[in-house]
Amino acid sequence: MPAKAGARVVVFLECFACTQEGVQKRFPGVFRYITQKNRQNKPTPLELKKFCPFCLKHTVHKEIKK
């Protein structure tokens, strides 16, 4: 029998400031981080404050659906 699927899933965190209009950026585009989360411990979407090299500052990165 196959092993039961784990509770860990891969999630993509997208810079919230890059998706807004009129934000001063170094490069065009949107920056994304790839990480893992435990579905049982964190059922709500992740929101982390991380550095965005496009905006050149620490911004809120929110989980997106892929």
Curated annotation (Swiss-Prot):
One of the record's GO cellular component terms: ribonucleoprotein complex
Biological processes per GO annotation: translation
Main location (coarse class): plastid
Molecular function via GO: structural constituent of ribosome
InterPro entries according to UniProt: Ribosomal_bL33, Ribosomal_bL33_CS, Ribosomal_bL33_sf, Ribosomal_zn-bd
PROSITE patterns reported in the protein's UniProt record: RIBOSOMAL_L33
Coiled coil: none
PANTHER family: 50S RIBOSOMAL PROTEIN L33, CHLOROPLASTIC, LARGE RIBOSOMAL SUBUNIT PROTEIN BL33C
Protein name listed in UniProt: Large ribosomal subunit protein bL33c
Naturally occurring in which organism (per UniProt): Gnetum parvifolium
Lineage start: Eukaryota, Viridiplantae, Streptophyta, Embryophyta, Tracheophyta
